[in-house]
Swiss-Prot record:
Disulfide bonds: none annotated. It comes from Nitrosospira multiformis (strain ATCC 25196 / NCIMB 11849 / C 71). Belongs to the NusB family. InterPro entries: NusB-like_sf, NusB_fam, NusB_RsmB_TIM44. The gene is nusB. One of its GO terms (molecular function) is RNA binding. Coiled coil: none annotated. This is Transcription antitermination protein NusB. The keyword Repressor does not apply. It holds the Pfam family NusB. Involved in transcription antitermination. Required for transcription of ribosomal RNA (rRNA) genes. Binds specifically to the boxA antiterminator sequence of the ribosomal RNA (rrn) operons. Residues 1-12 have a biased composition (Basic and acidic residues). The keyword Transcription applies. Residues 1-20 are annotated as: Disordered.
Amino acid sequence: MKRVEKRAEKQGRGTARKSRRRLARELALQGLYQWCVAGGSAGTIEAQLRDTEEFPKTDEEYFSRLLHGVLMQAPELEKEIQPCLDRPFNELSPVEISILLLGAYELERHPEIPYRAVINEAVELAKAYGGTHGHKYVNGVLDKLAVKLRAAEIGAKI
């Protein structure tokens, strides 16, 4: 099948298939949201998410690394994020908190992923799960954080 036909077929379905990494991020976001709202251990949250229909389609290792990594480093990540905010961290919605923690973790701990890809993925999550203009806020905060955490990478792009 030609490329154009494949693209048309995808467009005809209405949605493109999500990558395994994107699904891993979405499930990690669900877990982080649950943690923000109700608490719980990483192991308990992971066990619940492993029982979902979407789980076998995800990058399971990456999901686990994200969920456990963010939860273990949440206080440090919050300190990194706070100077980039226009209000106290605890005044953000649980969705924004979860997305920003996830984005900050990827910026800090996964230098193999380009900073623009990390920000784009976070913005897409905010568009799908956040408030009306939440994606703009997430974009602005993570842009500021990327300048701090990925200065060499950003400098090389200029």
